[in-house]
Design a protein with these regions (language model features):
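Short amphipathic alpha-helix segments
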Residues: 235-248
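Non-Sec secretion/translocation targeting segments of pathogen effectors
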Residues: 327, 331-367
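A short, compositionally biased
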Residues: 34-41, 251, 294-297
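Extended, low-hydrophobicity segments enriched in charged/polar residues
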Residues: 5-218
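Short glycine-/aliphatic-rich beta-strand segments at the starts of folded cytosolic domains
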Residues: 219-234
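Short beta-strand
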Residues: 255-259
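Alpha-helical oligomerization segments
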Residues: 260-334
């Protein structure tokens, strides 16, 4: 089956796999530019009871067909995912034009700037090294995912605020809307194993996690996971300097590995790993395990807790050189100021000496 035939089959048959209330729904498939300028086909099934509808991207489901899955099984899976994200009531989307109404719902999303040139054309964004920070309105959040609206230049013009104000507002909202967690890899793996233990042995999650932790090797963690409660757009958490400082208090200066836009790994700098080794690992993982639409960067970043700065590790020497030049320039400016001050003092003293000196009396001639 060709991909376009698959899309048409889904569009024509999806309602057969949905409840009766979707029988009269309008079914459409639209092409949508997503992260890294990936163009995906999004399925939407619109009903009269709700003014919004989930978008289900069909591209990954076709991969299942290519792997031998039956079309009916894939359609049933799409229908199940759709229903889990479906909202059965209207949402006041007109509020998105009023900054005061949506300011406490704004969140950040971190993406690669170069890979998103088309996507960024009509979006306000901030820059961090080779990354771009875009802003979204979090309309809804469930255990299955989130519903967001990306802020465009048109929306931004109506808000009447600066980009800096938008960025600050999004950072303020992060811990409320997307609470973060920072855990060692041992604990993270144990939690994954605990799910299977709880199901297979019919025990509670707390007991299952305790059992899983006993299976973990008794060695210190050298790798940590930064995540949030939705497991979506996790990389944006590193934008918050309070979070970075919290991590640094536990592990010191650290490397940040952008596993994807949804996952971030933290490795202490004193763990003995070189950034070039880590960068090679990131690049290999991106090429073999991360979907193109979820890749963030091929580079490794590091955090200087003393300076409160996050920067690309391959630019560390350049950064150090620039800081040294700035220090030299400041020293030079100070030296010039000191010399000028010394000359000024000398002139003042010289003038003061002239004003207070007593002129010598002329001798009278004796005739």
């Amino acid at each position: 089956m060709e991909y376009r035939d698959f899309v048409e089959q889904v569009k024509e048959q999806i309602q057969d796999f949905l409840p009766e209330k979707f029988a009269d729904a309008a079914v459409e498939v639209n092409q949508i530019v997503k992260n890294n300028d990936c163009v995906l086909d999004g399925l939407m099934v619109r009903t009269e009871e709700s003014n919004i509808a989930p978008t289900i991207y069909l591209n990954p489901y076709f991969e299942q067909i290519q792997d031998g899955a039956e079309l009916d099984d894939v359609l049933a899976q799409i229908a199940s995912v759709y229903q889990s994200h479906y909202i059965d009531h209207d949402i006041d989307v007109s509020a998105v034009t009023d900054f005061d109404k949506i300011k406490e719902k704004i969140v950040c999303k971190l993406i690669n700037e170069e890979a998103n040139q088309q996507f960024l054309q009509d979006k306000p964004y901030s820059k961090l090294e080779d990354l771009a920070v875009v802003y979204q309105i979090l309309m809804d959040k469930t255990g299955e995912g989130t519903a967001t609206i990306t802020i465009t230049d048109n929306l931004m013009d109506g808000y009447g605020i600066t980009l800096e104000e938008l960025h600050d507002q999004a950072l303020q909202n992060m811990d409320t809307l997307q609470p973060h967690s920072f855990k060692g890899m041992n604990e993270t793996v144990a939690e994954m194993i605990a799910v299977d233990i709880a199901r297979e042995q019919n025990v509670g999650m707390d007991e299952a996690k305790e059992m899983a932790m006993q299976m973990m090797p008794d060695i210190p963690d050298t790798m940590f996971v930064l995540t949030n409660d939705t497991k979506v757009n996790v990389a944006a958490a590193i934008l918050n300097d309070d979070i970075r400082q919290e991590i640094a208090e536990k592990v010191g200066d650290f490397y940040m590995l952008p596993s994807s836009i949804h996952e971030t790994l933290i490795i202490p700098k004193d763990a003995g790993m070189e950034f070039k080794e880590l960068e090679q690992m990131v690049q290999e993982v991106n090429q073999t395990q991360v979907a193109p639409g979820e890749r963030l960067s091929d580079h490794v970043y590091e955090y200087d807790a003393k300076e409160h700065e996050l920067f690309r590790s391959d630019r560390a020497e350049e950064r150090a050189k620039q800081k040294e030049e700035k220090r030299d320039n400041r020293h030079e400016r100070v030296s010039v100021k000191e010399k000028l001050a010394e000359k000024k003092d000398a002139v003042i003293k010289m003038n003061a000496g002239k004003e207070h000196s007593v002129p010598e009396k002329k001798k009278e001639a004796v005739i």
